[in-house]
Curated annotation (Swiss-Prot):
Annotated localization: Peroxisome
First-tier enzyme category under EC: transferase
GO MF terms, alphabetically ordered: alanine-glyoxylate transaminase activity; kynurenine-glyoxylate transaminase activity; L-serine-pyruvate transaminase activity
Binding site for pyridoxal 5'-phosphate: 77-79, 154, 204, 256, 259
Location of the region described as Binds to and confers specificity for 3-hydroxykynurenine in the Swiss-Prot/TrEMBL record: 43-44
Residues at which substrate binds: 154, 356
Cofactor(s) it depends on: pyridoxal 5'-phosphate
Temperature and activity: Optimum temperature is 55 degrees Celsius with 3-hydroxykynurenine and pyruvate at pH 7. Optimum temperature is 60 degrees Celsius with L-alanine and glyoxylate at pH 7.
An individual GO BP term: L-kynurenine catabolic process
InterPro entries cross-referenced by the UniProt entry: Aminotrans_V_dom, PyrdxlP-dep_Trfase, PyrdxlP-dep_Trfase_major, PyrdxlP-dep_Trfase_small, SP_NH2Trfase/AEP_transaminase
GO cellular component: peroxisome
Protein name: 3-hydroxykynurenine transaminase
Source species of the chain: Aedes aegypti (Yellowfever mosquito)
Catalytic activity: glyoxylate + L-alanine = glycine + pyruvate; L-kynurenine + glyoxylate = kynurenate + glycine + H2O; 3-hydroxy-L-kynurenine + glyoxylate = xanthurenate + glycine + H2O; 3-hydroxy-L-kynurenine + pyruvate = xanthurenate + L-alanine + H2O
Length: 400
């Protein structure tokens, strides 16, 4: 046998530097979560794996605040949650209304179009939420099968209120689907109380687990819609009836679907367990306190926040406006090279005009926030020596 020689790049050991991850995700994992990854990989049908899966389902119902039986995880990044909801609940020609004021709603528009849905769009500015009146008028006009809404948009730092929206949707026989990737466990979320029919979140964001596994939950009403489809879900991999069977949601004999990432499930279990041990209320309060400290520190530097109204700011992701004359990349590069701190740029509606600061995972402490503010200021001073930190007329802005 003759083979090409092995690549020289693999001759040395793997070296990954420690970094303080304070962008919009992924976040730093705790030592406990990372240790869970070192367990033995288990086979799909080992009893010990099913035991952990049951514990994860219990934890997910807690953080989603739901009693939905169809609560599970999908192998893949949080985009798989968006795909799964849309491809399971939409059939060719179904009307879906998407509230679009950020990059993730644009992704949903792209996906729903690919599934052959009749996509209608409720548009709005990236820094302001939709009102319940906006939603009601649009639902009355379009009569959609589903309404898709992003709860917390990591591309803008905007928080969209949801309370009361589920009832509006159900009054018009419409399902409410929610992206809670960047918001869950950073702000209050009540799936059952708010009458939400489908939701997913990201393991690598506020929860502080590794990426690659996506928690998702659907209501009995949504499950009924899926079961009554005229055609099977277009994507086998995201078929929630088959996935839910393996995750023990339907009182059926479990069947093989795909090899699940057992060690990611272990890590997610530990991340949720840490939240459960502290309690949702103190977990959320701590992140909100960290966000307030972030706002105060940025304002003291004369910097503006993209979302002007504090009521609608997402505590887990703050978009910081780039002052005129400042090269955002130089600041981010300096912070990484000198402080091992991630200061990430904008995305979607904030690309080129803002930085994004994350308060997620292990970085949800006042100590980390204060470090971020210190490193940010030092990086701005070092890369732009002429920049003047000041407030003008009570407004937060910087001058050069």
């Amino acid at each position: 046998m003759k083979f090409t020689p092995p690549p020289s790049s693999l001759r040395g050991p793997l070296v990954i530097p420690d970094k303080i991850m304070m962008g919009p995700g992924p976040s730093n994992c705790s030592k406990r979560v990372l240790a869970a990854l070192n367990n033995t990989c288990l086979s799909n049908f080992h009893d010990e794996l099913f035991q952990v899966i049951d514990e994860v389902k219990d934890g997910l119902r807690y953080i989603f605040q739901t009693e939905n039986r169809t609560t599970m995880c999908i192998t893949g990044s949080a985009h798989t949650g968006m795909e799964a909801l849309l491809c399971n609940l939409l059939e060719e020609g179904d009307i879906v209304l998407i509230a679009n004021n950020g990059i993730w709603a644009e992704r949903a528009i792209n996906m729903a179009t690919r599934y052959g849905a009749d996509v209608r769009v409720l548009g709005g500015p990236a820094d302001k939420p939709f009102s319940m009146t906006d939603f009601k008028k649009a639902i009355e006009q379009h009569r959609p099968k589903c309404l898709f809404v992003v709860h917390g948009d990591s591309s803008s730092g905007l928080l969209q209120p949801l309370e009361g929206l589920g009832k509006i949707c159900h009054d018009y026989d419409c399902l409410l689907l929610v992206d809670a990737v960047a918001s869950l466990c950073g702000v209050p979320f009540y799936m059952d109380k708010w009458e939400i029919d489908g939701v997913y979140t990201g393991s690598q964001k506020v929860l502080g687990a590794p990426p690659g596994i996506t928690p998702i939950s659907i209501s009995p009403k949504a499950l009924e819609v899926i079961r009554s489809r005229k055609t099977p879900s277009k994507v086998f991999y995201w078929d929630l009836l088959i996935l839910g069977n393996y995750w023990g949601c339907y009182d059926e004999q479990k069947r093989y679907h795909h090899t699940v990432p057992s060690n990611l499930i272990f890590a997610l279990r530990e991340a949720i367990a840490q939240i459960a041990e502290e309690g949702l209320e103190p977990v959320i309060r701590r992140r909100q306190e960290c966000a307030e400290q972030m706002y105060r520190g940025l304002q003291a530097m004369g910097l503006e926040i993209f979302v002007k109204d504090p009521e609608y700011r997402l505590p887990t992701v703050t978009c910081i406006m780039i002052p005129k004359g400042v090269n955002w990349w130089k600041v981010s590069e300096y912070a990484m090279n000198n402080f091992s701190l991630e200061i990430q740029g904008g995305f979607g509606p904030t690309m080129g005009i803002a930085w994004r600061a994350g308060i997620m995972g292990e970085s949800s402490t006042l100590q980390r926030v204060n470090f971020y503010l210190y490193a940010f200021k030092e990086s701005l001073k070092a890369t732009h020596p002429d920049y003047v930190f000041e407030k003008k007329n009570g407004q937060t802005n910087g001058t050069k």
